[in-house]
A protein has these predicted regions:
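Class A GPCR helix-loop hinge within the 7TM core
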Residues: 100-138, 289-292
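Internal alpha-helical transmembrane segments of multi-pass membrane proteins, especially GPCRs
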Residues: 56-59, 100, 134-138, 190, ...
Length: 342
């Protein structure tokens, strides 16, 4: 911890405005589009589409994270002061890291699936079945839960090192202790570097095969190039800045007493952490690129929703007209009876 609070001038004003702004936008967009993606992928899973299993898992991870964003907005708005229970802090941090690393894992699974479909369409077909995809998805969820369970068994609320602020930090304390640094380095290797290498190797092989295949139409080649570009760019933009800063923090913080460096690293780290939330928006959009029937499924779902809404509006209007007509009829009958009495 930082002993010399006289030199400690921590400022949480950046977090107070950055996170609520970014997270609010992410939440408003990602919740509806991930719900649509879940429904569309569920339809495809029933049709024995193995790729849809990975898309479903990806959308589920994004939706769970988007649903806890209000807690992180509240935390940032209060100047990085956690005012909820310690257990809720653990659950929120657990779901956040589950989203980070299930997302990278399932993006790697999608890349391998596309590699097998385009480079080895006739070989290894048993690896492109719905059953195999379900098994892989379950294994990913179990492994990620085990790797991130350290969050659920350790204390995750800390007093702000700048003691005069009297803030309670949730999960991301600073400076990092040596054991936290080792866990972070393990996360970087297993959750970031390995999926990144898999994605780059798969798409390099896919690009080579598609480019050299004379039978592939130019339009199909462009689709494959868009797919490669979108998944690679999404992965790099959302996760690379965060993991670079996390790596620097992990090798520097346990062994330095430079307060200014510690605070600078923490601020940059928090900015890159906000950037990772954009994957909740990007992942469902990728669904339109990796599945040929995705756009059709999503459009059908939207039409269905619009039809239901229109039906409800028509029903409400008919009910209002019927009610109005009934009242008018009753009024006419009443007037007629009054005139008869006169």
């Amino acid at each position: 911890t930082m002993n010399n609070t006289a030199e400690c001038h921590d400022d949480h004003s950046l977090d107070k405005y950055l996170f609520p702004f970014v997270y609010s936008i992410v939440m408003m967009i990602s919740i509806p589009i991930n719900c649509i993606s879940l429904c569309a992928s569920c339809v495809q899973v029933r049709k024995k589409n193995e790729l849809a299993v990975y898309i479903f898992s990806l959308s589920l991870a994004d939706l769970l994270y988007a649903l806890i964003l209000p807690l992180w907005i509240d935390y940032a708005w209060n100047g990085d002061d956690w005012r909820r229970s310690a257990l809720l802090c653990q659950i929120s941090a657990f779901l956040m890291y589950m989203n980070f690393y299930t997302s990278t894992a399932f993006l790697a699974c999608i890349s391998v699936n596309r590699y097998l479909a385009l480079v080895h369409p006739l070989k290894l077909q048993h690896l492109r079945t719905r059953r195999f995809s379900l098994i892989v998805s379950i294994i990913v969820w179990i492994l990620e839960s085990i790797l991130n369970s350290v969050i659920l068994v350790n204390k995750e609320v800390f007093n702000d090192p700048c003691n005069f602020t009297n803030h309670t930090l949730c999960y991301d304390n600073y400076p990092l202790e040596w054991w936290q640094s080792w866990i972070n380095l393990l996360r970087i290797c297993l959750g970031y570097l390995i999926p990144l290498i898999i994605i780059l190797v798969c798409y390099h092989k896919i690009y080579q095969v598609v480019r050299c295949n004379q039978a592939t139409l130019d339009e199909e080649k462009q689709k494959v190039k868009k797919l490669i570009l979108n998944i690679t760019v999404t992965f790099i933009i959302c996760f690379t800045p965060y993991h670079i800063v996390l790596f620097i923090r992990s090798i520097k913080e346990p062994y330095t007493k430079d307060l200014q460096l510690l605070q600078l690293l923490y601020k940059v780290y928090r900015i890159t952490q906000a950037l990772t939330s954009l994957n909740c928006i990007a992942d469902p959009i990728l669904y339109c690129f990796v599945s040929e029937t995705a756009r059709t499924d999503i459009l059908n779902l939207l039409r269905c929703c619009l039809c239901l809404q229109k039906h409800e509006e028509d029903h409400a209007r008919d009910h209002a007209l019927c009610s109005s007509a009934t009242k008018s009829s009753a009024l006419i009958t009443y007037r007629a009876s009054c005139e008869a009495e006169i």
